[in-house]
Amino acid sequence: MEHKNLRSTRRRYALILIILVGIILTSLALINTIGSDSSKNQLKDNHFISKTISVGSFPVGISVNPSTNVIYVTNNQSDTVSVIDGKTNSVTKTIKVGDGPAGISVNPLTDMIYVTNYYSDTISVIDGKTHVVVKEIPVDSTPWGIDLNSENNIVYTTNYFANTISIIDGIENNVITTVKTDKPWGIDVNSHTGHVFVANRDSVNVSTLKGDVMEKIAISDTPFKISPNNVSYNEKTNLLYVANSSLISVIDISTNSILEPISVGMNLVGLTINSDTNMIYASDIQNDVIYIIDGSTHMIKEEIKVGDHPIAVEINPETNTIYVVNEYSNSISVIIS
């Protein structure tokens, strides 16, 4: 009997041990699975270059039509605009424009594209349905930046050496008026609020224009340390971001107050924002990288190596695809996650 009880006891202990081992192994497997899933989710947040698209000589400007998923790139020395299909990420057409095309902006509601021609002092107007230039609009000297208000169909161009902003009627495609400012370069227009923001490159300030009211916001008292190249506005947070030489200035538009800047990079030029995700994208032409910055914390999330001299960056908010203009590589980096 004692031997039977002993064997029975041993069997029970063995069974318990087997069960415990099974529980431990199951737990470890579960942990590994969770870790694996977490790793997969983390990878989804990591961006990478999915394709590099060859375009014309010295591309400098880019605009995306999210309604048609078509991307337009200005090729400064080729005097052309490359048309890219966002589905295939391939060039479908090349359009001849004026001398030295630089800035470009598309109205998704009318499917009209506007191009600044830096050396011929004109704006080329392209019909997005036919991709044919339908008009050339004379403006002041050396137009560079351009953006538009899609709701009232008003187009704004920065004329660098003329120290002016041309305001154009997008229906008649004629200049309505011209506003004075100081060495304007980058520009961002918000269609919902009607605000126009301009980076005055040599004056260390930003102009804000709404209606006929022009204000200037000084972003630094050290004019030799920074140079405002570009601006981008997040209407949901009411914050304006300014790409400078080695930092991004942050302005609270509700009070026009300067907040803590974002220290990043060496020479920031390209700048864009996805207001829906509150993510900021900035290009550094010295380090040849794109910085992805969390708009809620102003911390750098990712740093992506791209082509040579990334002068501009744009995002399609519908597909969350990022397009980077590599000026010296004559290419576009397509970044996805």
Residue ranges and their predicted role:
Residues N5-I19:
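N-terminal Sec-pathway targeting helices
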